[in-house]
Amino acid sequence: MSEEAFIYEAIRTPRGKQKNGSLHEVKPLSLVVGLIDELRKRHPDLDENLISDVILGCVSPVGDQGGDIARAAVLASGMPVTSGGVQLNRFCASGLEAVNTAAQKVRSGWDDLVLAGGVESMSRVPMGSDGGAMGLDPATNYDVMFVPQSIGADLIATIEGFSREDVDAYALRSQQKAAEAWSGGYFAKSVVPVRDQNGLLILDHDEHMRPDTTKEGLAKLKPAFEGLAALGGFDDVALQKYHWVEKINHVHTGGNSSGIVDGAALVMIGSAAAGKLQGLTPRARIVATATSGADPVIMLTGPTPATRKVLDRAGLTVDDIDLFELNEAFASVVLKFQKDLNIPDEKLNVNGGAIAMGHPLGATGAMILGTMVDELERRNARRALITLCIGGGMGVATIIERV
């Protein structure tokens, strides 16, 4: 691959909470179209005929999100019919996978300008609506020793010795960092308010946040997944594989796990030549990407091998990275990643994450990549690494460099 892939723009919607949230009446297609419209406002001279493809991650591609929502967004937004559209699904990392795929297309020289991102309306299309062998088919569950992610998160905490106090302390940090970032205007460049067809404001902030969260309040919450474990026998399945563990300590609650929310994100990826032709200013370049599999029973340990792989591919070390952004699916996932790679607090999830602001499955990867582009610019820093744990036992990681 001889071409470089540059990030020219990275925007997102605010995240609306699932229950009685502000975005529950907004179609996921409308969230994406709104972002395309914003790109037009920011780049009025952009020749959209040069955009060869739109790649969107979406984890539950049924109902409002079915039928290739990326192509629907191209047509509904009035983009040229010559621009393609494809929806992809790598579970929680779908948004980052879309960006990585776009970068690979550009670096191959076969595409010059691609829009990538993701969308998930979890209030309109509940998680699991698309079915699937893993989780719903008893025979497959038996063959692959299926265990829900939440049980895997509690298993990580048990094996690593993370207490309830440890995961709650991390959750409190997430809320505090997110509140600080919002009050400091750190997201102002990338967050695009959602408006109705009359232009009236629907949502302009991440409404899942709880800035008034306290250590004492978190401690009062009951474990969220102990009942699921008992009902489905999932602890027993996990302990068949991890037989040296006597009992799983269920430490995760609604307060130290990622929030269920709605949202979308869009990133413009292109070659240097395309940017020059269109008068676009590159903000960062994609240095390297990597994907890794991991044990599907504990499931959520993939970020560590994916990170080691992408660092090796880029010829870099942990010390060469200024900022790390790991999706906060569950607090124990972040704590283990930090422990594995010896990452200092001041480099990790510096503006909070999904515990505070929510995890709109298909969009999150693109969202947190955009967060890192903004933060590198704000700090005048050089490199960031973005990674997510993934259902089925996988990890994806991407290194970007400010230009």
UniProtKB/Swiss-Prot annotation:
Q: Tell me the InterPro entries matching this sequence.
A: Thiolase, Thiolase-like, Thiolase_acyl_enz_int_AS, Thiolase_AS, Thiolase_C, Thiolase_CS, Thiolase_N
Superkingdom per UniProt: Bacteria
Q: Does the keyword RNA-binding apply?
A: no
For the cross-link Isoglutamyl lysine isopeptide (Lys-Gln) (interchain with Q-Cter in protein Pup), list the residue numbers.
Answer: 189
Catalytic positions are 92, 359, 389
Please give the GO cellular component terms listed in this UniProt entry.
peptidoglycan-based cell wall; plasma membrane
Q: Report the EC number(s), separated by commas if there are several.
A: 2.3.1.-
Can you summarize the PTM annotation of this record?
A: Pupylated at Lys-189 by the prokaryotic ubiquitin-like protein Pup, which probably leads to its degradation by the proteasome.
Entry's Gene Ontology molecular function annotations:
acetyl-CoA C-acetyltransferase activity
Its keywords, alphabetically, are: Acyltransferase, Isopeptide bond, Transferase, Ubl conjugation
Q: Which family does it belong to?
A: Belongs to the thiolase-like superfamily. Thiolase family.
NCBIfam families given for it? AcCoA-C-Actrans, PRK08242.1
Name the record gives this protein = Putative acyltransferase Rv0859
Q: What is the lineage of its organism?
A: Bacteria, Bacillati, Actinomycetota, Actinomycetes, Mycobacteriales
| Encoding gene (name) | fadA
